Amino acid sequence: MLNDIVDVLADPADLTPLRGADDFTRLVSESGHSYDVAKQGYVTLAAGKGIGHEGDSLEMVNSRETFLSNGHFAPFVESVSDALADVVERVAGDADPVILEAGAGTGYYLAHTLDLIQGARGVGLDVSVPAAKHLAKSHPRVGAVVADVWEQLPIRTGSIHALAVVFAPRNPVEFARVLVEGGEAVMLVADQGHLDELREPLGILGVEDGKIERLIAQSEGHLVPAADPELIEYPMQLGRDAIAAQVGMSPSARHLDADVLQARLAELPEQMEVTARAQLIRMRKA
């Protein structure tokens, strides 16, 4: 809940500390700004003109919840959680570890990580309000924040022990700012071959070439590689409903007409093997 993580939150306008007020119905900063806490338990922390990017729709969030809850990405979840646990063990010491997930979605990965790391607190940040509603109730030790990863993060400098980014936007400058000394960003990035069996028959978006190289180049001066990239690849057995949920939670959902997608799904086998393939990238604060 927000009261568990308010000590690491900051005013998005000027990064001054936030505290709860009026029985935690709002958060206020030392500079006098106030941010209402939604009845669902999340808070929107955005300065100026507010959130500038479109987040996942309710339909996309529901598809994500359906797909992930059936365990199709379990090896990805385990790998991310294990890496975060390794970071926390190394850098947290006697402090209560704080884990931030940027682009946390429904909180599926973050909740699993908090189950693994006893006593850790989680800050889930996402630009989508429908996602934040799920995120706020994903785990007792998660605080949900609606904020834009591309902007200055509403997080106090040097307050985060480990940071997760799973198939989500990355902001190396801000990640480095919020991490403690020695802290790491653990990033799961789709690799060439991910969902390849679905791309031609469904017309979904492909994985761009050189994503890993660009990530490392963009991080120069802020984050440095902490380990060699780890390839995670395995086959999934997916029925049509699971495939529909996978496409529905992805960026392709914004580009494909629903009727066209349904027609293409109907032409697929009732069950098919689909490749899951991603790289786990660990980068330490420079």
Where are these regions (language model features)?
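A short glycine-rich, Lys/Arg-flanked "PGG" loop and its adjoining helix->strand segment in the class I
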Residues: 172-186
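Conserved class I S-adenosyl-L-methionine
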Residues: 184-214
